[in-house]
Amino acid sequence: MKRTGLWLGLTVAVIAIAVIGFVAYRYLAPVRVDIVAEADGVPFTIETIPHSVLARPGEMIKVVYRIQNDDLLPVSAYGAITIGPAKNQDQMQVFLSQCGGINTYQSTGPEDYGVMFRVQPAGLSGSAHLVLKHTFTPSTPR
């Protein structure tokens, strides 16, 4: 009888430690953020630096979009920011986006545009993998 109680208590303790460890991991573990860019109807070559980052919850992260206008003339484009998956948009806050909104991109060579953001912990219902995407479209009809 004593041995059964010991094994039962040990099993409950191991399960409790595993559950506490899993919850702590979900709240403290870094969130993988893929940095993506898409040029839709504009003659841009875009490089993201870095392509992916492991962001600790609450840490301010800076990434760079290196944009080169491949046209001979300056191009005015609109940069739209989307965060995926859509149900976890509130998990990321973008504080600065130099390439968001309407900008004129010169044809003199690649230019660096910074984006600063912060992520919240995945928690129990969040995502451990997010995507920060900038889509560039013409701001005026061509």
Question: What role is predicted for each listed range?
Answer:
Residues 53-54, 59, 70, 96-122:
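Intrinsically disordered, low-complexity Pro/Gly/Ser/Thr-rich segments with frequent PxxP/GP/PP motifs
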Residues 28-32, 40-48, 78-84, 99-102:
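Generic detector of short, locally flexible boundary/turn motifs and exposed helical patches
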Residues 31, 59-61, 73-77, 109-113, ...:
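Residues at beta-strand starts and edge strands
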Residues 64-67, 115-117, 132-134:
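Buried hydrophobic-core signal for structured, non-transmembrane domains
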Residues 35-63, 104:
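Beta-sheet-dominated interaction scaffolds and their linkers
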Residues 73-96, 103, 119-142:
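Terminal connector regions
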Residues 51-85:
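Mid-length scaffold segments of soluble, non-membrane domains
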Residues 1-45:
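Membrane engagement elements in two modes
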